[in-house]
Amino acid sequence: MASNNVAQFAAELKMPAGVLLEQLQAAGVQKASEDDALSETDKARLLDHLRKSHGATDGDKRKITLTRKHTSEIKQSDATGKARTIQVEVRKKRTFVKRDDVSEGAEQGQAQVAEADDDAELKRREEEARREADLLEKQAQELRERQERLEREEAERRAREEAAEAERRRAEEEAAAKRVAAEAAAAQQQAAAQQAAAAEQQEAASTQSAQDEARAAAERAAQREAAKKAEDAAREAADKARAEQEEISKRRAAAEAEARAIREMMNTPRKAVVKAVEPPKPVEPPKPAEAKGTLHKPAKPEGAQARPAVKKPAGAAAPATTAPAGAGDRNKKPGAGKGGWQDDASKRRGIKTRGDSSGGVDRGWRGGPKGRGRHQDSSTFQAPTEPIVREVHVPETVSVADLAHKMSVKASEVIKVMMKMGQMVTINQVLDQETAMIIVEELGHRAVAAKLDDPEALLVEGETGTDAEQLPRPPVVTVMGHVDHGKTSLLDHIRRAKVAAGEAGGITQHIGAYHVDTPRGVITFLDTPGHEAFTAMRARGAKATDIVVLVVAADDGVMPQTKEAIAHAKAGGVPIVVAINKIDKPDANLDRVKQELVAEGVVPEEYGGDSPFVPVSAKTGAGIDDLLENVLLQAEVLELKAPVEAPAKGIVIEAKLDKGKGPVATILVQAGTLNRGDIVLAGTAYGRVRAMLDENGKPTKEAGPSIPVEIQGLSEVPGAGEEVIVLPDERKAREIALFRQGKFRDVKLAKQQAAKLESMLEQMGEGEVQNLPLIIKADVQGSQEALVQSLLKLSTDEVRVQIVHSAVGGISENDVNLATASKAVIIGFNTRADAQARKLAESNGIDIRYYNIIYDAVDEVKAAMSGMLAPEKREVITGMVEVRQVFKVPKIGAVAGCMVTDGIVKRSSSVRVLRNNVVIFTGELESLKRFKDDVKEVKQGFECGMSVKNFNDIVEGDQFEVFEVTEVARTL
């Protein structure tokens, strides 16, 4: 815009109006205020004046210098950690020279030289700006480190001062904090002021020439030096404050120790003596180092300081200052030598105890010197005035006696505390860790959860030492999805086998592990159940997998177990490949499936996500090759590797008890190589691998990474999901397995003991709660776990499912005997009872039910629980009666002559008496007559005589509401 006055021209030049007025007056242009008009002639005069003042001549108008300035902002953290915005200004200057026709070549060379100089100057300034930014960042980093060091030292200082008095500590900390904050604030304000001054100088220097810029650079160097000096001063002030605080803390600790020693001396109780004596002379307060007494070793008096600390023999001679024994006997009262309480006390004091420095020398009436010294020595015991707080390490399980020993108290004290807490325990009772820690805190000590002397630490040490070469391994792919969406059929088409036909009801109830050789490589598949009862089994599958293939039916969409599978995959951080199955069906809708999956957070690649969507058909085989290609592509991106020449490690996929083979476990090798004959440890089970079969039932000698195998030879059935590891010898495996078994048993018993009182109160509050005891035997560990969880979910407030026992294997006589004792029903899931068990069950009337589909087992147990529910009682109004006349009959009472106005009246019905439509009595009919004859019922429109049991206050005009109570069966 055109600048018509001084203020507008100053704004255009980005300079103060006052400075512009001074320059105009120096140029001979008389302008008094900012609002005065400014002409082009005035501007030309000002320009000539400025050129002359800077050394330019009128004839030299061939060269024009342009200065350009660019300002940007960067984020930089200061010493306090806060982000601050720093403005960075880059200046560029270019000189243009007007060419002459005569010396055009020379002028061009000069212009190039000038441009080269300008470029060099620009590079130099950019380098200087970059160095300044680096220096600022380095200074900020040093300030942060210094602040962290100061905070760390401040925390240590506070920890050392915790024993000091609260008020003094708080006041001194506040004073120190204020002083340090004031110094730091002063240093920061000084640095900020210097930076602001530097910024103002840079702003003012923007309108000056290259000479002014050189001066500004020198000034910035001086400012940096000043900032550095300010930081050094702040650091010295902080160090000085810290030294002062440490000196104050030391003096305070010494003063407190001296005060504590004086308090202990003043609070020491005097011992009872027979003879009244003068009070002893005051003892000098001990030094702080001498104030540390224990329960067994009181602080020594002044006269005993010269005695050596080593123990003396029992028969050592008394010191030279001790009077003869006869002199002490002469001062005894008559009868004092006959076993009075004074002699008993002296004998007890003479017993040699651990920590006693007297060596067993009698310090009582016999051993003391005559007169004053004797009585002074007898009153030197100092009882501890402050409780001794011990740090008690509490293991997972501990007996009452061991816990008392750890706290140096009698077991009876612990039993008293337990009785106050409502628990009756014995000295050998095992307590769990939580209860034991509560008792320790109750007795005034500090409880710490102890680290176990765990032999499993050897496993961790062994793992750190393995340094085998990492080689590529096949991917482990878990097939997940809703029930009946075609997971097993899809895998069946890949394996070219009929697996789904072998599953009961066409649904998968086990985890199947298979490895498939494809033209593109080996893939290991885990087929998980889709039924809602197998949540834990699906979680184990997601834990052991590398890639999840999510099978969704094109005609069904996203279902509850589909959402659960997505949650398992996301929790494990596993990539998902979506297989949209059943695309051959006429009602398949791929777009709807994609939209539903996008709502669950699974976005297809064509929508910008990272999950491949592959339409497949397990029936026709369409899309199978694309699915395998996408799976192997994901595996290639993951770069899966595992050591091969190393001891094997893996996870238990499934476990069962075979009648002929014993415990059988299906494991997935995750690292190393498992060979036949290796010693394996899986949870609480261990043993040597006697036989190893692949998924087709064929024997194999070894299994590498990502290969599933079935092993035999374990000591018991391991839990599904347990980690499998190969150990060098059987002794170590047995030691760790037995340790785990004992730990599990102790923790279980301790928790049962802790829950006894709670369960007793619960049973008292529950009242009439029906229990359905069940014994569950299944073929594999996963099915047993799923069935137990599904049945426990059926429990309600009125009927509760009680799992008496659950295990893997066939139904034996022990199970029948347990069912007889607990009156339980035995459920066999894919198992059968042997001949002896069946015969025993028939003789004892035990119900054994067999199932092979989890739906049926859950439904029948639910029906049995419904039968145990108390029936619901409902009232049905059968008729209304109006009282027309009341008769008083001796020995009977009031008899109402009535008219049945609605419904029917039966002799066995109940009745409510209504007066003015308000219920005044509810009871039963005592008699129902018609013309002096007893009748069973009277219908509408007939008259009858009625009497109500225990109610004679019948008035004409009353109404009788006749009703019956019926019971209705309830369902869950």
UniProtKB/Swiss-Prot annotation:
Region (G2): 506-510
Protein name according to UniProt: Translation initiation factor IF-2
Annotated GTP binding sites: 481-488, 527-531, 581-584
Source organism of this protein record: Burkholderia lata (strain ATCC 17760 / DSM 23089 / LMG 22485 / NCIMB 9086 / R18194 / 383)
Pfam families per the UniProt record, alphabetical: EF-G_D2, GTP_EFTU, IF-2, IF2_assoc, IF2_N
Location of the protein in the cell: Cytoplasm
Residue span of region G5: 617-619
Described function: One of the essential components for the initiation of protein synthesis. Protects formylmethionyl-tRNA from spontaneous hydrolysis and promotes its binding to the 30S ribosomal subunits. Also involved in the hydrolysis of GTP during the formation of the 70S ribosomal complex.
Gene symbol of the encoding locus: infB
Predominant location category: cytoplasm
Keyword GTP-binding listed: yes
Start-end of Pro residues biased regions: 279-288
Superkingdom of this protein's organism: Bacteria
InterPro entries: DNA-bd_dom_put_sf, EF-G-like_DII, IF2_assoc_dom_bac, IF2_II, IF2_N, P-loop_NTPase, Small_GTP-bd, T_Tr_GTP-bd_dom
Biased composition (Basic and acidic residues): 48-63, 121-181, 212-263
tr-type G domain segment(s): 472-641
Keywords carried by this UniProt record: Cytoplasm, GTP-binding, Initiation factor, Nucleotide-binding, Protein biosynthesis
Ranges for region G3: 527-530
GO cellular component: cytosol
Region (Disordered): 48-85, 99-385
